Amino acid sequence: MANLGLDYFNTHEMSYSNPYTGNAATTAGSLTKAVQRQLSYTFNQLLTYQRNIRSHSLDVMIGHEYYELKQQFLGAQKTGFPFGGLYELSAAATLSGASSQTDKYAIESFLSRVNYNFAQKYYFSASFRTDGSSRFHKDSRWGKFWSLGTSWRISEESFMKKYDWVNNLTLKASFGSQGNDNIGSYYAYQSLYNMGLSNGSLNGAGINSLENKDLKWEKNENYFVIFGIAS
């Protein structure tokens, strides 16, 4: 089974102040225009296998998933209109500001899962996945996460038949790890520069943050044991 999901946003914004009244009268009017686009897609493929043989039941799944996001922004502001009613930047005399930005993010995952039960009494599950995120340096890009779980439906045992008031008595235990790549920046492993330091006719650059190639996946581990009864 394969699935493809696509999201696309295209936003246009305009802010205009006439040159006759208000705060913009001192600058002979003001016009700001901005365009923002965002495209993201998810593509996953899953293979499943199920088999029941007498009291044995097996369910296996393997899969692959890829997600990519691209954001683009472009905006500018100008002042100094000869008269009102002009809504194009080219009609104004003075450039007050302009900026643009592009962000990219991608994550690729390989995953697997196995579920097994015998006689609807003894259950076992295992999963493993590895995820690669563009937020990290190539030497630390991939994280590995897995889980194990088991449960015993005690109420299905023959020695429990005399306790007919117990519908479901279960003992469960599991261990698992999960990963998180949401570290607040798409490019924290790289050195980042502020390119808006102009002096005269030439633009300059100043370092904003140093590279950190040692950034890795945040990993959370969970353990639990549950004893449940229902009548």
Labelled PLM ranges:
Residues T21-G22:
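N-terminal transmembrane signal-anchor/hairpin module of polytopic inner-membrane proteins
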